[in-house]
């Protein structure tokens, strides 16, 4: 007699499937966030016992995670594995059901979890520091999953604005090339155009896509200050070198870095140099926020120039990079053209005295019994501008070389003196004439002299009629004579009758 028994016939092989919640890989198999694997086994007669399920997880650099318990509905049965620590992982899934049917093995190839951003260090230059010597930044990059994925950028700030100067600077590489890489920049060339404020930005990414950014702002200041004037009256005075009225002197000093010291010295002809007192003799203002060039403005009070004299203003400063700056002397290594652009020499003369003009040979209201007359003109001034000589005869401008000549002494033209000679001719028929001489000096003062109402004539009749008093007296006398003659003639006739 047989006992009734139940049994199951199962000829269907189980099916294994593995899925992940994070499939955003970089460089094939690098992930910068956690991954959770869901293992699904489709089997009607499922058993989670270890003799049926085998899921070995391999981990490098960390501890292998465990499979978290099974749950399911119907024939589908699920378990999860969480990969939440940095490391390299791989695993396989094998399952054999109760009937001995084996599922096709599911193999998950190795992948990396890397949630750690690269370590970046910038040396060789420091934030908000100024350099007048070697400038050679060094970037050190450390990461377990190194990738040569970097962006280095030098943004230069100069007086005219910003520019991308990245391509101007070269580097050499070092490090082990696996977990550490070093970029060593070569010393910036010591040329004027490299002076400026630099924002050096470094951005590096590893194989998982983690990125780190770092930046430093530093200054290259090997050539010191540029001095200039944007004040129109000051610029005009510097270019001319002379003035007849004292005025404020305004000068700008432009430097890559802030100034730590400054002074203004005034030299005056006939006296010693004097260091001026800030806020009494001059004012000083400076603006700098660390991310732009420093602009300092010196305003020297006009009261310092009240006397007639020759003046020289010297501005000296020391900047944060320890350069000593002088408005009259730029760095000696610069070209002449570069020096001229960076210097602003301030030397000028205050002259309030008008030129002295004298005319000899003729006088006001004089009558000359000559057909021609030689006249001498002498102009005197310490700062005479001989090009401003104007000679007019009866409001007609005379021409040098044609109407008058400039006379030099045997040693050449005397400094501060001009002598001219003019030969006046009696061509106006005894009419009164006026000679006027005007001349200016380099400071803008004007001197003048005139001789008015003179007469030049060799003709006795022209001279007679040119003298109204003589003409009136003559005709008055003649009238009296005629009247007397008429009177006597009339009287004689009356007696005869």
Protein language model features and the residues they cover:
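Short, solvent-exposed loop/edge segments of extracellular or virion-exposed proteins
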Residues: 15-28, 121-131, 228-240, 355-367, ...
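C-terminal membrane-anchoring or membrane-association module
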Residues: 479-497
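Extracellular acidic loop/turn motifs
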Residues: 41-52, 62, 141-152, 253-261, ...
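Aromatic sugar-binding surface patches on proteins
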Residues: 71-79, 174-187, 287-299, 409-423
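Surface-exposed, short loops/turns at beta-strand junctions within beta-sandwich domains
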Residues: 81-88, 188-197, 300-310, 422-432
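Flexible, low-complexity linkers/stalks enriched in Thr/Pro that connect modular domains
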Residues: 3-14, 108-121, 206, 216-230, ...
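Short, solvent-exposed loop/turn segments at the edges of extracellular beta-sandwich modules
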Residues: 1, 96-102, 205-210, 318-337, ...
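Membrane-proximal extracellular "stem/stalk" segments
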Residues: 341-354, 378-380, 393-395, 402-463
């Amino acid at each position: 007699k047989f006992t009734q028994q139940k049994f199951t016939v199962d000829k269907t092989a189980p099916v294994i499937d593995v899925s992940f919640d994070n499939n955003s890989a970089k460089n094939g198999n690098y992930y910068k966030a956690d991954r959770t694997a869901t293992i699904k086994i489709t089997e009607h007669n499922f058993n989670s016992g270890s003799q049926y399920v085998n899921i070995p997880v391999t981990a490098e650099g960390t501890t292998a995670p465990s499979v978290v318990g099974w749950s399911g509905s119907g024939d589908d049965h699920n378990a999860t594995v969480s990969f939440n620590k940095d490391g390299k992982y791989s695993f396989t899934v094998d399952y054999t059901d109760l009937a001995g049917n084996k599922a096709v093995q599911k193999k998950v190839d190795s992948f990396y979890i890397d949630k750690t951003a690269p370590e970046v260090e910038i040396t060789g230059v420091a934030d908000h520091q100024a350099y007048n010597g070697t400038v050679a930044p060094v970037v050190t990059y450390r990461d377990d999953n190194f990738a040569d994925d970097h962006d280095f950028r030098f943004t230069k700030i100069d007086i005219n604005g910003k520019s991308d100067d990245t391509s101007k600077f070269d580097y050499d590489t070092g490090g082990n090339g696996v977990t550490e890489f070093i970029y060593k920049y070569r010393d910036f060339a010591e040329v004027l155009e490299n002076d400026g404020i630099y924002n050096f930005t470094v951005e590096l990414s590893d194989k998982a896509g983690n990125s780190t950014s770092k930046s430093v702002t530093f200054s290259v200041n090997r050539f010191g200050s540029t001095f200039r004037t944007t004040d129109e009256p000051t610029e005009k005075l510097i270019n001319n070198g002379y003035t007849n009225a004292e005025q404020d002197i305004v000068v700008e000093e432009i430097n890559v870095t802030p100034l730590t010291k400054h002074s203004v010295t005034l030299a005056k002809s006939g006296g010693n140099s004097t260091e001026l007192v800030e806020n009494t003799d001059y004012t000083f203002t400076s603006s700098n926020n660390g991310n732009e060039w420093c602009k300092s403005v010196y305003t020297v009070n006009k009261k310092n120039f009240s006397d007639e004299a020759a003046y020289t203003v010297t501005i000296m400063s020391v900047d944060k990079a320890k350069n000593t700056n002088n408005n009259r002397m730029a760095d000696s290594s610069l070209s002449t053209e570069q020096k001229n652009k960076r210097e602003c020499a301030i030397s000028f003369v205050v002259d309030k005295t008008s030129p002295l003009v004298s005319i000899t040979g003729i006088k006001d209201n004089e009558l000359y019994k000559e057909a021609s007359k030689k006249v001498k003109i002498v102009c005197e001034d310490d700062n005479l501008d001989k090009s401003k000589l104007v000679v007019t005869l009866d409001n007609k401008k005379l021409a040098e070389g044609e109407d008058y000549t400039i006379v030099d002494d045997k040693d050449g033209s005397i400094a501060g003196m001009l002598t001219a000679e003019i030969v006046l001719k009696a061509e106006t028929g005894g009419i009164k004439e006026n000679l006027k001489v005007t001349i200016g000096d380099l400071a803008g003062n004007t001197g003048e002299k005139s001789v008015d109402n003179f007469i030049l004539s060799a003709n006795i009749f022209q001279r007679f009629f040119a003298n109204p008093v003589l003409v009136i007296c003559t005709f008055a006398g003649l009238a009296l004579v005629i009247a007397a003659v008429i009177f006597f003639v009339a009287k004689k006739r009356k007696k005869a009758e």
